[in-house]
Amino acid sequence: MYQPLADRLRPNSIDEVVGQRHILGEQGVLRRIIQGGNIPNLIFYGPSGTGKTTVAEIAAAQMHRPFHRLNATTASLADIKAITADVGTLLAPEGVVLYLDEIQYFNKKQQQSLLEFMEDGRITLIASTTENPFFAVFGAVLSRSTVFEFKQITAEDALPAVER
């Protein structure tokens, strides 16, 4: 089966992630949260190609919960309800991790619909956006999430990955 190069080279651990030392370095807050395994709702923002999706996948793996990925440009509330259908069963007794890419494309009502699932623990939301979340994300979702900024990757950051 064909697998894109980016997926074949995607890091599997925090130590393999390129850049983002300010949050993933040895004393980085996000590193500590992920290593702790009890991950809150998170919002990642920054330019494309900075590792937001990769870090979300690594975080979800630490939680040992089912991981679902949706893109807000094409997803609907029905998709979210379908994902939460197995919560509480043997398939997902402790809830699921939902990675919602491009959350800024969900309108206010769609973002509000996430609250019920976030508050009762059916979903641990990890959302990403290229927009400033303080303008693009509904306030109630934002207040229930921890926000991290991902910065552009520099040539210096990329060198260790190229050498690998």
Would you name each region that the model predicts?
Residues 23-27, 65-97, 108:
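Short glycine-rich substrate-engagement loop in P-loop NTPases that contacts/grips substrate
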Residues 98-100, 114:
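Walker B beta-strand of ABC/ABC-like P-loop ATPase nucleotide-binding domains
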Residues 1-3, 32-70, 85-88, 115-120:
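Walker A/P-loop
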Residues 70, 99, 124-128, 149:
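Structural recognition of the conserved hydrophobic beta-strand(s) that form the central parallel beta-sheet
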Residues 71-73, 146-159:
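Conserved AAA+ ATPase "SRH/arginine-finger" region at the nucleotide-binding site
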Residues 15, 42, 148:
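Conserved beta-strand position immediately N-terminal to the Walker
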Residues 1-36:
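A short, basic N-terminal segment
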Residues 31-35, 109-143:
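Conserved catalytic/switch belt of AAA+ P-loop NTPases
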